[in-house]
Amino acid sequence: MKNLPVRDSKPDQEPAANQNAEHDLKARLLSGDAETIDAIILAGSVEIRAKDLHAIIRERELVEKKFQAISMGYHELRHQIREIMRTLEAAALVNATDPLPRCLAEGTFAAQYLLKEDDLMPDSVPGVGLADDAILVKSVVARHGRKLARNGWDF
C-alpha cells in the first residue's frame, strides 16, 4: 500500500499511468484477488508495533462511531471488526509487547484501515465505500481465524 500513486503538481489530476495503476489495484482488490489482498495486508502490517496496537485501543470510540455508521449491508464487517477489537483490547490489557504476533499486527492494521476515510475506495462513496474495508477485514479474520476471537491471550 505504500506504493500507491502520488499526485503531481496539479492537485485535481493524476497522471494517466497512476490513475490506471490505482484503478487496477482497486479492481483486483474488489474482485477478491487473494494475492493482491495478502500483499496489501502484509505491506500495511509489517511495521505495526505494540505502540500502534495501544493507539488503536485509545481510538476505540472512533471505531464504535464507525460501527454506528456502517450500513446494514455490512453486518459481517461490523461483527468481524468487533471481534478484532476485543482481541486487541485483551492484548492491550496484558500489555502486549514487540514483536507482536502476526495476528495482532494484522488485526491492528485492519482496524486502522477501517478508520481511514480516504483509503483505496473512499468510505463516503454511497453503497460501496466500505467494500475494500470489508474485504481486508474479512481476509485478516480468515488468515487468523480463532486467534482473533479468543480470550485469555498469553502475549
Feature names for model-found ranges:
Residues 101-136:
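Membrane-inserting effector segments that mediate pore formation, membrane fusion
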